[in-house]
Amino acid sequence: MTKYLELIKKEIDETELSVVSKKVIKSTINKIQKFNEEQYKNPNDLIKIIKTFLKNNENLNTSHTFIAHIKSILKHTSLKDMISEIDQNEIEKLFLKYKNLKERKDDAEEPSKKHQENYIPYEELVKKYKQVKDKLNWKDKLIYGLYVLQPPLRADYGDVKLILDSDETDYSDINENYFLLGESKMIINQYKSNKVMNKEGEFIHKPLIFMVDEDVYDLIYDSVKLGIEEFGEMRTYLIEDRFGKKMKPNTLSKNITRISMLLFGKAIGIQEIRTIYCSRFQLQDEDCSIETILEDAGKMGHSISVHIKKYMKRYVKPK
């Protein structure tokens, strides 16, 4: 790989780019040269290096600058003749992705006065809940745990059917949501943004499917066990109201706010818990991880644009 990169450096020197531009672009080439020569031997391996660098880098500005320089190298040197069209297209996609993220860097909004007053850092929400959860009744313990221990932190948990034996039960109806007890798997079919556009321009169904972590599974399992002891049979839905019906989003939201008042003396609702979670990292922070933001948006079931514009707030964090 080194001989190809040295050739590209010479070609950069021969361009009409400014002295500063030449210097910073060659600095990016130096970063590429630091990767294992035995593992990455020729230009066809460049895309692997690019993806590895972007994956491991935590800083948005650095990532954007890096991929922008690669794009500039493609434009001004023979690199475009050394790598495949597929890789060139992949580089273009990566450039557009990081360009879009950088342009949105300052889009995060200030929280409302109410949201700021109710703000508690996410890690403190989790810590406090874990400290006092055993003092809550099993239903409150379950409801709040679902919303602070693991994303997607949605208002759709009241409409989730409990499935004891997934091998013998049909759970293919996309109009229903399911939790498979035997597999620790949550399948959320019905939620606000469950339609995405495919390459043909058609909207298709996109379920949220994820494994719950051990803490959440234990909460659900214990609640099922206690529910059977209390009512003599397993309930139908993950969260039910006092009439044994699935809990409606509005009722669920009121319960979350009520439990927040018990725990923190603040009326923190579902929407605020979502924004607190999504704002763990600030776009303005130097150590903001782009991959984490992309991962968070995917888990929450909304677009990157919605994630940044609606849910990432510039909270004033307590000292």
Where do the PLM segments sit?
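Flexible interdomain linker/hinge and immediately adjacent N-terminus
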Residues: 83-130
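Basic, Lys/Arg- and aromatic-enriched nucleic-acid-binding interface segment
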Residues: 122-156
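Short, amphipathic alpha-helical "recognition" segments used to contact nucleic acids or chromatin
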Residues: 143-147, 275-287
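Conserved tyrosine-mediated DNA breakage-rejoining catalytic core shared by Y-recombinases
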Residues: 160-216
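Catalytic-site neighborhood detector that most strongly recognizes the C-terminal catalytic loop/helix
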Residues: 283-287, 293, 298-319
